[in-house]
């Protein structure tokens, strides 16, 4: 009988072989160059807090606690993503941030190398996950993931969301698109996993193909907020929209201030024992007597759709 890892590597080789094709516009290296008149791009800023922020435990790079994120620019598309490492692995001596961080860094590298199709964000997630499965030294862990791709020329946003991270698209002060949260049961989101052989059949593991995928047109000035559940569990839509009203233009500095304001407010609410958070409301709906915010890692990527410039 194959172990989980042995079987995973065989699947990874087969999948990677089938994903070798790329969009012709995405070939030939990353970075800028060749933007056509009328192309769209994303101006993106991020902010976040690790759950242990009060203890001064911050990680290097684009990681906030067990969360990770990336923002990558290619001539054919702007791509960004967030991932939330499953903290339960810490009980088994595994650093949950290693899985989520490596997953996001692999996604970023694929985009910069042009090894992706803008209309297929699930493909980015699948190829990245398969590369993790192929590691000679197993990288154990689990993570949710959300990938957002703006195709410059078609002005379409393509998304893939697995688990309870997610995105909002705001236009004219209203949410016009949003991701669907995926849960097996309360507080147990869909997740990508790599488990040791002895844990076969015990650790939850979903396929990248299980990600909820959407595609839709966007307009200049649309606001896209991509975040881990640490935000959405602590701030309802109306609070997020109130903060977004402060965003008056597409200057990076303005976006950065707003992203920080949103992340800071979510972080403060997470430690308020009297606050009826979205997470507490969801818990009550599931028969649990819970009140207060949910202390968690928080990652926020805030983007505005603008005219593309190299």
UniProtKB/Swiss-Prot annotation:
Residues bound to Mn(2+) 1 are 84-85
Query: What does the entry give for GO biological process?
Result: negative regulation of mitophagy; positive regulation of ubiquinone biosynthetic process
Where would I find the PPM-type phosphatase domain in this sequence?
A: 75-305
Give the Gene Ontology MF terms in alphabetical order: metal ion binding; protein serine/threonine phosphatase activity; protein-macromolecule adaptor activity
This entry's Enzyme Commission designation comes to: 3.1.3.16
Q: Where does Mn(2+) 2 bind?
A: 84, 229
Entry's transmembrane regions: none
- Alphabetical keyword list: Hydrolase, Magnesium, Manganese, Metal-binding, Mitochondrion, Protein phosphatase, Transit peptide
Transit peptide located at: 1-74
Query: Does the record bear Transit peptide in its keywords?
Result: yes
Q: What is the documented disruption phenotype for this protein?
A: Global knockout of Pptc7 causes perinatal lethality with decreased mitochondrial content and metabolic abnormalities. Pptc7 knockout animals exhibit increased expression of the mitophagy receptors BNIP3 and NIX, excessive mitophagy, and decreased steady state levels of mitochondrial proteins.
Give the protein's cofactors.
Mg(2+); Mn(2+)
* Function according to Swiss-Prot or TrEMBL: Protein phosphatase that plays an essential role in mitochondrial metabolism and biogenesis. Positively regulates biosynthesis of the ubiquinone, coenzyme Q. Dephosphorylates the ubiquinone biosynthesis protein COQ7 which is likely to lead to its activation. Serves as a crucial sensor for mitophagy, though the underlying mechanism remains ambiguous. May dephosphorylate BNIP3 and NIX and thereby directly regulates mitophagy receptor function and stability.
Its assembly, as annotated, is: Interacts with FBXL4, BNIP3 and NIX; these interactions are important for ubiquitination and degradation of BNIP3 and NIX.
Question: What is the protein name stated in its UniProt record?
Answer: Protein phosphatase PTC7 homolog
Q: Which gene encodes it?
A: Pptc7
């Amino acid at each position: 009988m194959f172990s989980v890892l042995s079987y995973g590597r065989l699947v990874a080789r087969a999948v990677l072989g089938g994903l070798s094709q790329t969009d012709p516009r995405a070939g030939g290296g990353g970075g800028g160059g060749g933007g056509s008149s009328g192309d769209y791009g994303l101006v993106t800023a991020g902010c976040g807090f690790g759950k242990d922020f009060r203890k001064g435990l911050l990680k290097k790079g684009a990681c906030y606690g067990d969360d990770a994120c990336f923002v990558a620019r290619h001539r054919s598309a702007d791509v960004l993503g967030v991932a939330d490492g499953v903290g339960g692995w810490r009980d088994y001596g595994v650093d949950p941030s290693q899985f989520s961080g490596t997953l996001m860094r692999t996604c970023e590298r694929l985009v910069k190398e042009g090894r992706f199709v803008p209309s297929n964000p699930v493909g980015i997630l699948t190829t990245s996950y398969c590369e993790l499965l192929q590691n000679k030294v197993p990288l154990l862990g689990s993570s949710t993931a959300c990938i957002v791709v703006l195709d410059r020329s078609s002005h379409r946003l393509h998304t893939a969301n697995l688990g309870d991270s997610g995105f909002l698209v705001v236009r004219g002060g209203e949410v016009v698109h949003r991701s669907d949260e995926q849960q097996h049961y309360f507080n147990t989101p869909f997740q990508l996993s790599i488990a040791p052989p002895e844990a076969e059949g015990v650790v939850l593991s979903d396929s990248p193909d299980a990600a909820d995928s959407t595609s839709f047109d966007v307009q200049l000035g649309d606001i896209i907020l991509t975040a881990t559940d640490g935000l959405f569990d602590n701030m309802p839509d109306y609070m997020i929209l109130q903060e977004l009203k402060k965003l008056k233009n597409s200057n990076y500095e303005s976006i950065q201030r707003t992203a920080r304001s949103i992340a800071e407010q979510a972080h403060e609410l997470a430690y308020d024992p009297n606050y009826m958070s979205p997470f507490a409301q969801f818990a009550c709906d599931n028969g649990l007597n819970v009140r207060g915010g949910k202390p968690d890692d928080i990652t926020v990527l805030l983007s505005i759709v603008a005219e593309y410039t190299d």
